Amino acid sequence: LRFLCALPNMETHADLIAGLPLYHLHEIFEDVRTLAGYAAGEIQLESLKLLPGTEMRRRAEELGIKYSPLPPYEVLQTHEISVSELQTARQLSRLLDGFYNTPAWQTLTRELILNDEQFLHRFLAYLTKVNLIDQPMSLEKRGLILYEFCKQNYPEYQIQAAIAWIEAGMSLKKL
């Protein structure tokens, strides 16, 4: 994957799957950091689905996987990841989609991920605290949130956040 991400003529999209047997929440966060370090073009994080007729579904009990009997048959819990941890993974997926996977905010988000291993935890806690993690947000709203978060928690990135804002075509009057 490192090789593919390093190719200059293509963008690599990497997928992580929460709810796989033996996969812990802390490993998901580590894998996001690793993929950010590879400069993956997008990092997708989804929950495992146990579709009828699949080997994984047949072995669910043996593997310690509890899943919804209704479509989309998402994993609800495993021996390694609790219900609340899967909820955290879902919220991390929203964070990645809204910030890392958005070209305007990707460079800054990647740098924050790589330079502070607690960034994802802190930013996720902030987005949850201000009730925004599950809200649809415009590009501008996400930029304002990232700028304010940097201003409060990472002042050394405030200028970079302002530059990303300008490069995204936003007015400085709104910062």
Where are these regions (language model features)?
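Radical SAM enzyme core and accessory elements
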Residues: 91-175
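A structural motif corresponding to the C-terminal lobe/cap of the Radical SAM core domain
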Residues: 1-117
